[in-house]
Amino acid sequence: MNNKLNISLLLLFIFGCDEPTYQTQKSTTSQPEFDDIQYIEGDLIQINNYFGLIDSVNNHLFMSIGLNEISNFTGNIKYPENYAITIKDDFIYSNQNYDFGNIILGEPIPIKILKNDTIINDYDLIFTNLSTISVSTLDSILDDPKVFSEILINDIENDKAYQMFAGIEIRGGTSQWYPKKSYDLEFWDDSSGIETRKESLFGLRNDDDWHLDAMFIDLSRSRGILGMDTWSSFARSHHLSNESEAQLAQRGHLVELILNKQYAGIYSMNEQLDRKQLKLKIGSGLLYKTTSWSDEILFLGIDSEPGASLYWEGYELKYPDLAMVENWAPIYNLVNLVAYSNDEDFLNNIESLIDVDNAIDYWLFINAIQANDNGGKNMFIYRYEIGNPLAFTAWDLDLTFGNKNTVWTVDVSDERIISNNLYDRLFELNVNNYRSRVKTRWEQIYSNNLYSNIVYRLNEKINKINISGANTRENNRWDLEIDYNQKLQYITSWLEIRLDYFDNYIFENF
């Protein structure tokens, strides 16, 4: 969408027919339109490229701004005809430039919206250096199916604003019970949802499918993407030589979310980890997701044979979306070999079933950051194409970097080494000099400024949160007392101790 959004189009959305319907060649059913949501007039205010996003519960009008603009900021103000606004009691014409002076992020600036000389809305204008998103729905948001919504996005990275339709649903398993929910978004070309719409947001991939991660049990609001960044920095996979644009991890961008006119807090807007992200071959690639703990997940045994289903003993078939028994053959054969083969069979066959270099990197990764929930569950296992071995990548990395904020991790020792039966057998049988390969690879990774690079990325993320004022808003919204500087210090200290311990562990055991 053009970043200079057309005001007349916005007026049509807001002040159009009383009972609008949207007709397409594929559907004659009445569809919801933007004005069904009945946007408060404040959402039509634009400053430069960005929409003002309304939090009507707290009477806040959020506006994104780049850090390079906050000194002596002059903004071009736009709003529809038949309205008027004042900023600090100064009357502002539409399309007028207004001198805000030096912007203090998070500090309220009084703004009033008038119609027929009557004040209809009285807000505090809040500038933030984070990208901002507003999602408004007609219906309650469910786990499934996606419900119709309209969405406004202020994208700081691209200096663009977007207005579009989207389907939204609650995401996750256990996390669905948290008060702060995660969501899946699918951008739609129109209100019917028949055709999707791709956008390249925040310098990330061009796609229609996005994940809003609430990061609720991670009190640093940083660990998930920090872990993904770390994995991406050194992960190997056999197919990367053929697919230079493949990403072995999600990438994400910190945003502030307003959901149905109420501030919802700090989120990470993430790419999906799927066939497209990994650049697996259409038609011959395979992608499995591990969703729950089982003997099969840990390569310990097989309780049942896979059937014509998308699910098998803790695994979910994500691609292809075809419930066929033969799609389970590669992962079944791997579990069967690891769990039941004698040593000779294991030595002779394991390297034809898995990408051992990738497996080495994955084991080093989950132990470097102590990913306590990713040694079996919370993995993706993929095949690039027929004839290629399986490889591993991670997702859902909130229980990492010393996160003890759950009943599952509160008592976990910081010296725990994560493994499963696959890694145990690789080590015990020393497959093709596995131990020396692990040691050599770790020396390469650790000596390449691993600690300082992670700390640098963590500082970037925490500083963005603190500078924006979102730290206070997040605490107020969810009745928390998070000290983000304390979280920064904790993770930094924890990581230094963990990496030193793990380095000694490798030296002594490999």
Name these PLM-found stretches.
Residues 14-16:
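C-terminal motif of bacterial Sec signal peptides marking the signal peptidase cleavage site
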Residues 2-10:
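Sec-dependent signal peptide recognition
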Residues 164-166, 174, 178-179, 322-376, ...:
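Middle-to-C-terminal accessory/interaction subdomains
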Residues 62-79, 87-89, 115-226:
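Conserved NTP-binding catalytic cores of kinases and kinase-like/nucleotidyltransferase enzymes
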Residues 146, 250-256, 375-382:
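A short glycine-rich, hydrophobically flanked beta-strand micro-motif that places a catalytic Asp/Glu
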Residues 137-139, 155-157, 170-172, 187-189, ...:
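Short, flexible loop/turn elements at secondary-structure junctions
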Residues 186-194, 198-217, 221, 233-238, ...:
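Internal "kinase-insert"/substrate-recognition segments embedded within catalytic cores
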Residues 18-130:
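Beta-rich interaction/scaffold domains
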